[in-house]
């Protein structure tokens, strides 16, 4: 990623993928009548869409290239702020949902901060710093919010009558 346009293409994809994944998680937990966690995931998807709109607004008048999914320069296989689906469970609590969201925001913040610290393009560094600062605010907000929810006791995921999938 060399240009502001390429940076914005990454920012747009990052927020879009985050919103889609949070919606997928909300849909999955809604099926299991986990309303509190579903609502938290819907809020996170909404916030991702707000950030997506901000990134798209910044892209007005900028040459933003179309980047093929396999050509994005992510630290891992997925965009850094995409919540890890492996960390979910149909009985997860708000504590778990917030932990998942917090980790995704930390990865997003780290991604942007890394660019702000090391990128050769001054304009990209400046934009990345702004994005990193905003993500740091989200990390703080989620860190404060998670304090309101106690970590669940051991065995929280035990279910004597788990859902079954018919083949």
Predicted regions and their residues:
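Iron-associated oxidoreductase/ferritin-like identity signal
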Residues: 1-167
């Amino acid at each position: 990623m060399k240009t502001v346009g390429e940076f914005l293409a990454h920012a747009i994809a990052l927020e879009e993928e985050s919103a889609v994944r949070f919606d997928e998680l909300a849909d999955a937990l809604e099926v299991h009548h986990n309303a509190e966690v579903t609502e938290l995931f819907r809020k996170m998807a909404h916030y991702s869409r707000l950030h997506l709109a901000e990134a798209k607004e910044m892209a007005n008048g900028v040459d933003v290239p179309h980047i093929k999914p396999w050509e994005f320069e992510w630290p891992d296989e997925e965009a850094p702020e995409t919540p890890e689906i492996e960390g979910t469970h149909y009985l997860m609590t708000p504590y778990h949902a917030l932990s998942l969201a917090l980790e995704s925001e930390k990865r997003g913040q780290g991604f942007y901060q890394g660019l702000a610290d090391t990128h050769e393009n001054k304009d990209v560094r400046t934009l990345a710093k702004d994005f990193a600062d905003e993500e740091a605010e989200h990390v703080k907000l989620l860190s404060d919010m998670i304090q309101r929810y106690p970590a669940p006791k051991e065995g929280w995921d035990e279910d004597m009558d788990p859902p079954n999938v018919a083949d």
